[in-house]
């Protein structure tokens, strides 16, 4: 049994009972409502017309094949796909990984099965669970890494570091964001920042943010019209420890947040780092904001609030959780982008889920430890002054660990022998090595089995409850305490 995820409002949970079988369970009342065997499901017809017709698929129950930058598949390629099933031996694909996204509690789900061959990992199926039919199939040029959607938009992240944005009402492609070309853009944006320090440009942070946003828009448009010669060779995101992440707000505003590559350091021109986050308006297909260096390590986990106004981030070290204003508000101040900071713990942790409740009063945090943490957002004790976030770097325990792998901070030998500069250097090093004890800890917690992977959901209908689903086949309902402490188990069920 492998638990995949809850839907957007935590009314349903998706589990994989085997390498090719997917089941969807209602959370309240608890029970199985849908099951599909991806190994035996076959499409009935194909039509390479480039657009999806919902009415046609409803009336005829036909599946429509849409290709994105790839030609029609031949019989030889189909045979090659079957051979891939026997050749896949890596940890990524051998157990049959699914990429699946539900559309709230509707009958539409998006499914990609990366365990049925490399070519099938490029195919995304939009399935109607009530009719048990495939509405359309979208074939991409590279394997699918992640899918997010709401009632307006669907975004697909590929292993080639590209994000495809669709209008979900007609499955019309709206935009393609190439993260590598954005990476090249940000190198250009940094040149503007350096010029401002020498007096070439006005050194106002708001102006620089506008310059960076304009460059991002130009690079995004260029990714659709043609390739950039300065784009570096693509990585394989599926099999890389460092890979982009993306999240989409649940409301109709459709704010997309995705991690972005930082500009290479002077002493490491070929360095790759995902320290930055881009805020993108998919409804109007335009970038909104750019958050620079949100962590000292690579951003490993993201969550966006229901209305797209707040963004939660965590690095690959998993010790600090930060909450930012995304900048979609009209009264947004770039100098006060950091809203809250929480300390999960001092032990390193691989975080794989952050989640807001709908009222934006709480954040849930799930990782590979024996504790699930709940942090309270309306606690004024962990508010931060605006000047702490003006330059995108904050004191945290991660600085100690990051300094071991980040030689950009330099050594005393690299500093000119000037007493004031040497004193300033050592004061910064000492300050960064002292853990910030003022960060708030969790408000509530849940103890789980560390050997099982779990996922968390905040039900919209029951704001004082939290759902936990685990790979051992258990579905648990906990009551959130009114005072800091451990959550109380109120109900337990089994996925069968």
From Swiss-Prot:
Domain writeup: Contains a beta-propeller domain involved in specific binding to phosphatidylinositol 3,5-bisphosphate (PIP2). The L/FRRG motif is essential for the cytoplasm to vacuole transport (Cvt) pathway and for the recruitment of ATG8 and ATG16 to the PAS in nutrient-rich medium and in both its recruitment to and dissociation from the PAS under starvation conditions.
Phosphothreonine sites (modified residues): 213
Pfam assignment, any one: PROPPIN
Cellular component, GO, one term: vacuolar membrane
Protein function: Required for cytoplasm to vacuole transport (Cvt) vesicles formation and mitophagy. Involved in binding of phosphatidylethanolamine to ATG8 and in recruitment of ATG8 and ATG5 to the pre-autophagosomal structure. Protects ATG8 from ARG4-mediated cleavage. Essential for maturation of proaminopeptidase I.
Region (Disordered): 41-86
Record field: compositional bias (Acidic residues): 75-84
Localization per Swiss-Prot or TrEMBL: Cytoplasm; Vacuole membrane
Chief localization: cytoplasm
Family, similarity comment: Belongs to the WD repeat PROPPIN family.
Modified residues (Phosphoserine): 237
Membrane listed as a keyword: yes
Keyword Disulfide bond annotated: no
Assigned keywords, A-Z: Autophagy, Cytoplasm, Membrane, Phosphoprotein, Protein transport, Repeat, Transport, Vacuole, WD repeat
Ranges of Low complexity composition bias in the record: 46-57
Protein name: Autophagy-related protein 21
WD repeats: 1-35, 148-190, 294-334, 346-385, 448-488
BP GO terms, sorted: autophagy; protein transport
Chain span(s) of sequence motif L/FRRG motif: 342-346
């Amino acid at each position: 049994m492998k638990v995949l995820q809850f839907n957007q409002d935590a009314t349903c949970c998706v589990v994989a009972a085997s390498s090719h079988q997917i089941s969807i369970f209602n959370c309240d009342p608890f029970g199985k409502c849908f099951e599909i065997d991806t190994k035996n499901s076959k499409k009935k017809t194909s039509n390479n017309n480039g657009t999806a017709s919902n009415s046609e698929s409803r009336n005829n129950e036909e599946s429509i094949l849409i290709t994105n930058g790839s030609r029609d598949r031949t019989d030889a390629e189909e045979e090659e796909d079957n051979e891939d099933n026997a050749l896949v031996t890596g940890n990524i694909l051998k157990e049959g990984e699914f990429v699946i996204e539900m559309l709230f509690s509707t009958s539409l789900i998006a499914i990609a099965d990366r365990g049925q061959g490399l070519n099938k990992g490029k195919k995304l199926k939009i399935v109607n669970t009530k009719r048990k039919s495939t509405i359309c199939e979208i074939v991409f040029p590279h394997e699918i890494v992640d899918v997010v959607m709401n009632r307006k938009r669907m975004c697909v992240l590929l292993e080639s570091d590209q994000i495809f944005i669709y209008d979900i009402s007609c499955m019309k492609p709206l935009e393609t964001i190439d993260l590598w070309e954005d990476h090249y853009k940000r190198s250009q944006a940094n040149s503007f920042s350096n010029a401002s320090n020498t007096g070439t440009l006005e050194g106002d942070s708001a102006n620089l943010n506008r310059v960076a946003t304009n460059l991002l828009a130009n690079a995004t448009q260029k990714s659709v019209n043609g390739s950039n010669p300065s784009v570096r060779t693509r990585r394989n995101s599926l099999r890389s420890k460092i890979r982009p992440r993306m999240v989409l707000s649940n409301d109709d505003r459709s704010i997309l947040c995705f991690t972005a590559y930082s500009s290479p350091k002077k002493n490491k021109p070929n360095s790759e780092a995902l320290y930055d986050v881009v805020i993108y308006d998919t409804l109007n297909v335009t970038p909104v904001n750019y958050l620079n260096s949100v962590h000292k390590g690579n951003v490993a986990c993201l969550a966006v609030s229901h209305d797209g106004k707040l963004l939660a981030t965590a690095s690959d070290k998993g010790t600090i959780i930060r909450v930012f204003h995304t900048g979609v508000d009209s009264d947004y101040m770039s100098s006060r982008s950091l809203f809250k900071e929480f300390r999960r713990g001092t032990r390193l942790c691989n975080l794989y889920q952050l989640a807001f409740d709908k009222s934006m009063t709480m954040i849930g945090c799930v990782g590979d430890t024996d504790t699930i943490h709940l942090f309270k957002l309306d606690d004024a004790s962990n508010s931060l002054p605006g000047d702490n976030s003006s330059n995108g770097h904050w004191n945290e325990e991660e600085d100690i660990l990051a300094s071991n792998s980040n030689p950009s901070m330099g050594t005393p030998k690299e500093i000119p022998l000037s007493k004031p500069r040497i004193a300033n250097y050592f004061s910064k090093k000492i300050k960064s090595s002292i853990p910030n004890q003022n960060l708030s800890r969790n408000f509530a917690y849940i103890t789980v089995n560390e050997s099982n992977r779990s996922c968390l959901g905040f039900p919209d209908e029951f704001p004082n409850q939290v759902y936990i689903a685990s790979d051992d086949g258990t579905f648990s309902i906990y009551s959130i305490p009114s005072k800091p402490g451990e959550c109380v188990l109120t109900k337990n069920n089994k996925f069968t």
